[in-house]
Amino acid sequence: MMQNNNELTRISIAILFITIFIATVNCSLLNFASSANAETAQQIQAKIDQKNLDIQNLEKVIKGYQIQIDDLGSQADSLSSTIKSLQLTQKKLEANISVTKDKITTKTFEIEQLGSQIDTKENNIGDDQRVIAQSFKQLNQMGNTDITQIIFGSHSVSGALNTLEELSVMQKNIFDKISSLNKDKDQLEVNKSASEKAKSDLLSLNKQLADQRKVVLSTVSQQDSLLKQTNESETSYKKLLAQKKAEQAAFQAEINNFESQLHMLMDPLKLPSAGSSVLVWPLSSVKITQYFGNTDFSNANPQIYNGKGHTGLDFRASIGTPVIAALSGTIIGSSNTDLVRGCYSYGQWLMIKHANGLSTLYGHLSLRSVSVGDKIATGQIIGYSGNTGYSTGPHLHFGVYASDGVQIKKFDTSINCKGATIPVADFKAYLNPLMYLPKQ
């Protein structure tokens, strides 16, 4: 009877080994099938690598355009240099569009690649689960065999030891399968998260592409408008600049008069402490062209600044440069003073109210990609830099305010800018942005 039990045990062990062997062969066949598709995976990776190389080459071209634009910006302001700068800007923007298209293609390939990896992992998990379930079933069937029956039912001590060793090996194989299963599950979650992020990035890139195309059209329109206004005459261009300066000064005088009468209650304790670096830079590459307060430029133009100095920071930023939110918050203001004929101020602008008592302003944009009421994340693209409003060249005006001391006002009775909407503030509400930005 013991001999029969021993034979049954050996048969069960053999069946279990065969089960694991067949499952292993199936996995090998699956891996072989995967290797048959590996060429496709390699081709996808090769395409990704090629697109990344294309992007690097285009970025070199863009850098070359930017150097030429910066050189023109350092020259005396003239119609010819302005037109040439706009033409170079258009070429740069079109190159930016090509980069974004390549990024979209690359991201699409990455999503395809991750999808294939997810399918493979799910198949592996299913196979491992079936092997483990079958193995446990076989072990349960063997569970009724007492170990003494295995030992004393064997023809020899070595036979009994071999049987026990076979059981030990089986147990290890099952544990290995469980470990492999857990690793596959972990990697599956990683791949799924990466796939979701890639899909989110793809949506952002498609929106960015649409925005960049709008900026190109805006640049072409700006160039055509300038040529019509000046009739391609340098003298007419100089007169136009002088007219803009005079009209901007007149509107600024109205603003200064209004703001001087504002006496809003502000609690300094509600504001972040200076040096806290609660904001991030609104551009990926930072070059400050005018600081906060009484700068050389503001002192040289008292008719514009009225002795209160420059109310923010100016950053060098060619037309179409992505502008990002310095901190999460809500868009509380958005307008375009250029829509009011003869009104030269911030041009296209946005204001974000943050939860820490601060509000930030982004002026002279070429395009706004968010709307009033939108919830914004730190670092999110909210628009693109430009040369709108009263601007001596493409740049970003960045202002920081105490939220309790600033309001959005529509100038319904303005002499110079009737209907224009801009932020106005108690003089004490204007804050130096460098108090809250990281050190360069």
Pin down the residues of each PLM region:
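Sec-dependent N-terminal signal peptides of Gram-positive bacterial secreted proteins and lipoproteins
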Residues: L8-S34
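Non-transmembrane, heptad-repeat alpha-helical coiled-coil rod segments
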Residues: I67-D70, S74-T89, Q171-K239
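Long, contiguous alpha-helical "rod/stalk" segments
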Residues: N57-K137, L209, V220
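Heptad-repeat coiled-coil alpha-helices that serve as dimer/oligomer scaffolding interfaces
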Residues: A95, V99-S116, T120, V215-S260, ...
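N-terminal secretory signal peptides that target proteins for export/translocation
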Residues: M1-T9
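Extracytoplasmic/periplasmic cell wall- or extracellular glycan-interacting regions that localize
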Residues: K228, E232-H354, L358-G363, L367-S369, ...
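Active-site-proximal beta-strands of protease catalytic cores
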Residues: G329, V372-G389
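Short coil/loop "hinge" linkers that interrupt or connect long alpha-helical coiled-coils or helical hairpins
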Residues: E112-N182, Q222
